[in-house]
Swiss-Prot record:
Primary localization: cytoplasm
HAMAP family attached to this UniProt entry: Hydroxylam_reduct
Similarity remark: Belongs to the HCP family.
Record's keyword annotation contains Iron: yes
Protein name: Hydroxylamine reductase
Organism, scientific name: Salmonella paratyphi C (strain RKS4594)
CDD domains in UniProt: HCP
Modified sites of kind Cysteine persulfide: C405
Length: 550
């Protein structure tokens, strides 16, 4: 096992990365190794997808499957070894079908990619794990060095984050052939184990630029189906009655669940990154979407244990449900998996609803505590002139984007302390689950404009980018000249690709933490600092002083 893709990875003087019987996330060595094997199979599939496009062949089954299967290897998504192997087998079957399509056009069609003809050696998980050793990400570290390995992993993990957003967009009916062609090209190239530093740096920026397009179609998918988010108050306390909790990012799953629970007497609560759903008109119209429950994903083993109903996980993040003994009432969807828990294959939530009706639910309603969400792209753009007016009248000094992933490290209290230290004449724009560090606190307003503005899920960084570009255009300056600072927390691969997106768009002087990615060497950090001004957090006082004086 070797995995260094998330922020909580093991760090020792000898090196970074989880390389024991089990990773810090709970992923076993078996599952981790089989995920490496799956990635190799997906690289071979992408190699043939690139070749097929040379013949004018676009196989939508391949395009639909590839990013989804890659998503299953993201942190805290799928811990179920047999299902990972199932994805690998499906990848190989699709590859062979695509290869046959190519050969039907050109009998001499061939693909030089080293992953292009990969076959699984056995049905036995142990044998497959031994085969996976050929594809462990750091297998040639001694030959290429830590810097090249780090850049390879930056590209691989960044592309993995983009694949997750591609799957979210696909679920909502969004497809862009250019994006998929670019995805396959990059995925296939990474299967050649590239070792050129400049080419890898260029690839990282290409992934960032591609992901900006992915976030654009994801935004289109969400707003076309569910309307543009508008500011909405959400209760974060319990309401009497039977209940279901839904977590993750998949708004379509939430919509289906709301439709199927309407009139049943079962209330629905959002959790984690599902919180922004309350801002969408077509979702909040359901009166039994009664509120948001819990806090950051890392607290779920305590909070889920206390929730008196079933829980549905639609995407990341799931952690061991046996710890809180709620494994008999947690359900996984799509690419999510945990050994031994119930998995919903389709869109029928009937078994979950039936379980909810058998459980007690909340015995009474608590005193409501309301927070505001729903500052989507249209709302943000509608406030652009107000922001400019406040800046010109010196009522608004600075905007801080404080957001990103949450996690368990105590150092993440930095982001709570930073938000509460922001001066009263400054505004906080937030997104993703890092907001749970401070989103239930009171921040007041500036002439009626809330000082805490919740822009949505992690992918809604797109809205923040569009706002920044709009403000810069209206003020006749560059984005980096705005009174705007980005203070970002990271945990997994979606955050990595958001960072690459920002860097590829030329955004500079980002402050990130609580620690640098484990695959970033001192040399790579120095390069990113020199090119983009990227740096790690220090202390709240020092960072605040520096950002306000910039």
């Amino acid at each position: 096992m070797f995995c260094v893709q998330c922020e909580q990875t093991i760090r020792t003087p000898a090196g970074n990365g989880c390389s024991y019987a089990q990773g810090m996330c709970g992923k076993t060595a078996e599952t981790s190794d089989l995920q490496d094997l799956l990635i190799a199979a997906l690289q071979g599939l992408s190699a043939w997808a690139v070749k097929a496009r040379e013949y004018g062949i676009i196989n939508h089954d391949v395009d639909n499957f590839a990013p989804r299967a890659f998503f299953s290897t993201l942190t805290n998504v799928n811990f179920d070894s047999p299902r990972i192997v199932g994805y690998a087998r499906e990848a190989i079957a699709l590859r062979e079908a695509l290869k046959a399509q190519c050969l039907s056009v050109d009998a001499n069609a061939h693909c030089d990619n080293p992953m292009a003809d990969l076959q699984l050696v056995s049905d036995d998980l142990g044998e497959l794990q031994r085969q996976a050793a050929e594809f462990i990400p750091n297998k040639d570290k001694a030959a290429i060095g830590e810097n090249i390995l780090g850049l390879r992993l930056l590209c691989l993990y960044g592309l993995k984050g983009a694949a997750a957003y591609m799957e979210h967009a696909h679920v909502l009916g969004q497809y862009d052939n250019d994006i998929y062609a670019q995805y396959h090209k990059i995925m296939a190239w990474l299967g050649t184990w590239p070792a050129d530093m400049n080419a890898l740096l260029e690839c990282a920026m290409e992934i960032g630029q591609m992901n900006f397009k992915v976030m654009s179609i994801l935004d289109a998918g969400e707003t076309t189906k569910y309307g543009h988010p508008t500011p909405t108050q959400v209760n974060v306390k319990a309401t009497e009655g039977k209940c279901i909790l839904i977590s993750g990012h998949d708004l379509k799953d939430l919509y289906n669940l709301l439709e199927q629970t309407e009139g049943t007497g079962v209330n629905v609560y959002t959790h984690g990154e599902m919180l922004p759903a309350h801002g969408y008109p077509e979702l909040r119209k359901f009166k039994h979407l009664v509120g948001n429950y819990g806090s950051g994903w890392q607290n779920q083993q305590v909070e889920f244990a206390r929730f008196p109903g079933p829980i549905v996980m639609t995407s990341n993040c799931i952690i061991d449900p046996t710890v809180g003994s709620y494994d008999d009432r947690i359900w996984t969807r799509s690419i999510v998996g945990w050994p031994g828990v119930s998995h919903l294959e389709g869109d029928d939530f009937g078994p979950v609803i039936a379980q909810a009706q058998q459980m007690a639910g909340f015995p009474y309603s608590e005193i409501p505590h309301l927070i505001t969400v729903g500052f989507g792209r249209q709302t943000l753009l509608g406030a652009a002139d107000t922001l400019i007016d406040l800046v010109s009248r010196e009522k608004l000094r600075h905007i801080f984007l404080v957001g990103g992933c949450d996690g368990a490290r105590g150092e993440r209290n930095y982001f709570t302390d930073f938000a509460t230290s922001v001066p009263d004449d400054c505004l906080i724009l937030t997104l993703a689950c890092g907001k749970y560090r401070f989103n239930k606190l009171e921040f007041g307003d500036i002439e009626g404009l809330p000082r805490l503005v919740d822009a949505g899920q992690c992918n809604d960084a797109y809205s923040a980018i569009i706002l920044a570009v709009t403000l810069a255009e209206k003020l006749g300056c560059g984005v980096n000249d705005l009174p705007l600072s980005l203070v970002l927390s990271w945990f997994e691969q979606k955050a990595i690709v958001i960072l690459l997106t920002l860097l590829s768009l030329g955004v500079k002087n980002i402050v990130t933490g609580p620690t640098a990615p484990g695959f970033f060497t001192p040399d790579l950090l120095a390069i990113l600092n020199e090119k983009f001004g990227l740096r790690s957090v220090t202390t709240v006082e020092e960072d605040m002083k520096q950002l306000l004086s910039a």
